[in-house]
């Protein structure tokens, strides 16, 4: 039996173009596809996450801000040098860094979704043993 891997993350927004532009221009995620409704209106833009796809989908719901840890957080793996550069790019785009840890910087995208830039040096645990507490 094969192990499951990330296929995609999906995020709803009332403004697909704006959110995709932020993730492409500020965080460097390349666009890989656009999908349209039968009437020709934009339904989604897909961005490359490297190990999967980030699907930015049209939603009729207005974004709701989650304070602290919430339902949505997109954390990107970066080098320490990239973290510093991305912090500058986020600030220039109006997405101020809300908090920092030794390894990770946290900000919000234009819809208020939490994003993180992390260079945690340890590999993520793998396999069934990783799920066991203690």
Predicted regions and their residues:
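Conserved beta-strand in the GNAT
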Residues: 55-57, 115-116
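N-terminal beta-strand motif that seeds the catalytic metal site of vicinal oxygen chelate
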Residues: 1-18, 71-74, 78, 123-134
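Vicinal oxygen chelate
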Residues: 14-17, 69, 73-114, 121-122
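A short beta-turn/loop motif at secondary-structure boundaries
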Residues: 37-40, 64, 109
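Residue-level structural signal for beta-strand termini and adjacent loop
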Residues: 37, 59-60, 118-121
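Core segments of cupin and vicinal oxygen chelate
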Residues: 11-53
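Short, charged/polar surface micro-motifs in flexible loops or helix N-caps
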Residues: 50-54, 61, 80-84
């Amino acid at each position: 039996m094969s192990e499951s891997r990330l296929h995609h993350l999906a995020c709803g927004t009332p403004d697909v173009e704006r959110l995709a532009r932020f993730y492409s221009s500020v965080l460097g995620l390349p666009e890989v596809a656009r999908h349209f409704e039968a009437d020709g209106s934009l339904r989604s833009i897909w961005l490359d996450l490297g190990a999967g796809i980030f699907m930015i989908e049209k939603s009729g719901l207005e974004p709701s801000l989650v304070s602290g840890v919430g339902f949505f957080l997109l954390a990107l793996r970066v080098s320490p040098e990239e973290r510093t550069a991305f912090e500058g790019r986020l600030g220039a785009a109006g997405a101020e860094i809300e908090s920092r840890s030794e390894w990770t910087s946290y900000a919000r995208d234009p819809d208020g979704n939490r994003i993180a830039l992390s260079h945690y040096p340890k590999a993520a645990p793998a396999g069934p043993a990783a799920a066991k507490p203690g």
